[in-house]
Amino acid sequence: MRSHSVVCIGELLIDFFCTDVDVDLMEGRQFLKSAGGAPANVSAAIAKLGGDAAFSGKVGKDPFGYFLKRTLDAVHVDTSMLVMDEKAPTTLAFVSLKQNGERDFVFNRGADALFTLEDIDQEKLNEAKILHFGSATALLSDPFCSAYLRLMSIAKDNGQFISFDPNYREDLWRGRVSEFVSVAKKAIAVSDFVKVSDEELEIISGVKDHEKGVAILHEIGANIVAVTLGKSGTLLSNGKDREIIPSIPVTSIDSTGAGDAFVGAALYQLANTDQIQSVDADFVKLREIVAFANKVGALVCTKIGAIDALPSLDEIGVSL
């Protein structure tokens, strides 16, 4: 890896989307298999833009695990830190959507839950310019949670730039929201760049007002905060300056992976920033970074899928 690379650490899994109309999983018969996992999506977004991205995580040494590795390899993500477990299966998620918006969700957790510090190539991690922690599953339980927080602490001690996206999933944290808030705050405390949705901001900060919520995240320890607001754009703050950066109008077909695309686009630019540790003081630069990330996130919504919908730099130029 080169010194301007980004390593994304977390889960890589299979999403099975039920393509039958208005049925629950018990009645569903047809499913579309797709590569998933927020950190993996971020690594793919960076690579498709032409950046250097690596993924670190664990899958099963099974057909699904090989499919996932091949998917990341195809978009030129470095998978040399992807561990394939011979005993645990690849994590699988099954989702169906009814016309009333009700979601049926089953999560079969596998190899990603067993990710430990022993699975990490610390020497390679130390070479990275940015470490991104954006797992929806890492904070759920040990050993993954302890490994995640420990890696963030090591990166902080090394002076590396730390990115964090809590990726709250109600289906996974039902009945354990206070536990989610507690571990998310531990991660935010050591993070340089924190991306949250407006829902996540309210859950973590405990307040509905966006500006007050952002101030709380800064008090916890975040240097740069980006709150995605959907069509309204992104609220950007560095603790001193604060502004809503507008998005671009698009006809949305599928918003899957839009948040991950936003993060990937932001990290792609941050990785190419010379003075990254002081970038939080340059609000003009931050504004440019978020404006570009907004565009990438919006463009992803115009296509089906997560990784397949991610644009290249050339495609962004044509679209805009």
Curated annotation (Swiss-Prot):
What SUPFAM superfamilies does the record tag this protein with?
Answer: Ribokinase-like
Q: InterPro entries in the record, alphabetically?
A: Carboh/pur_kinase_PfkB_CS, PfkB_Carbo_kinase, PfkB_dom, Ribokinase-like
Which superkingdom, per the lineage?
Bacteria
Q: Which UniProt keywords apply?
A: Kinase, Transferase
The yes or no answer to whether the keyword tRNA processing is present is: no
Q: Which GO terms describe its molecular function?
A: kinase activity
Please state the Enzyme Commission number of this protein.
2.7.1.-
Q: Quick check: keyword Transferase in the entry?
A: yes
Q: Which family does it belong to?
A: Belongs to the carbohydrate kinase PfkB family.
Q: What is this protein called?
A: Uncharacterized sugar kinase YdjE
Please tell me the species this chain comes from.
Answer: Bacillus subtilis (strain 168)
Gene that this sequence comes from: ydjE
